[in-house]
Amino acid sequence: MRNTLANKIKLGTKTLISDPCYDKNTWCAGEVNTLPGDYIVQEIAEMGKHPTLKGLFVVHSSQYEKIDYSDCYEDSLIDVGVDSGECGIYDSEKYPEDGIGFDASNRGENYAIYRAPDGDWGVTAGNFGGDGSYKAYLHRNGDGKVDAIYLDFTMGGYGEYDDEEYDEEEEDLEEE
């Protein structure tokens, strides 16, 4: 279940964990102090007839052989809100103030994972439905800097969009 697709990104001293549709100051994004450098990106997937993306793991290249996603711990201060059905990890200094607009043609074929527009300062995973949130798990080195991040897409809560419920709400508003 590990390393189904590995890529590299570069992160600075501050890293943003967010839905890319949000601006930098959105309450449901998280920013952490990270060990700067190259990070290996891994999809954690359940393989089979219909592969399912279970999580996204980034680990500093110096720790790649030492740290697994199961070594990360929940950071209760980060509630990663998801509105666009996407969630990612980005270098805070390069993340646009008003969020990222993506071209859907950049999506990967298997698990809808793709990089940020300039190719090296972040990674986004998508195709999760709509509104909700996901847990961010962190690993910190001896200096307290984050050197690995695991986004768990199996433990999040997001409500499925209910067309009938929405239509009923719209009808009620029209009647008033």
Predicted regions span which residues?
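Intrinsically disordered, low-complexity acidic regions enriched in Pro/Ser/Thr
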Residues: M1-E176
